[in-house]
Amino acid sequence: MAIFKQLFKVILLAGISASAFASNIMLEHGYIRAMPASVPNTAAYLTLSNHGAATELVSASTPVAREAMLHTLIEEDGLVKMRHVEAFPLPEHGQLTLQGSGDHIMIMGLKAPLELGQKVPMTLSFANGETLNIELEVKSPNDAPAAQEHHHHH
């Protein structure tokens, strides 16, 4: 009888790990902004595609920093300010784009300076219970695709 319990656990765990790869959410592109070694914070910018039902990005984490928070930029009294937000909507069969001029993931309390070209692991968590493990490269803002696409707006 004990062998059936063990077999059941193995099948259950195999089912859980297989479902982790069946995500409808995919990273299209992204990067982490390179900062001087003396600066303890940076930001991640990315585009996610959702091939399923609508959900929300509710948190991010990375082992290279104390915390990662969802932030947006708002204009208040003529000044642009950063604000923490609880979630970013990811529409059904749509995209979520986080870029320098708006929504982004603020990475705070870096444990060590990040190097250009370094690959940084990050886990994104969604309101529907899904998680997405991604890797973002540290890039200079001038080399990043989003900076090139939006450079003429500044």
Kindly give the residue locations of the regions a language model identified.
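Bacterial N-terminal signal peptides that target proteins for export
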Residues: 1-11
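Compact, glycine-rich, soluble single-domain proteins
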Residues: 24-154
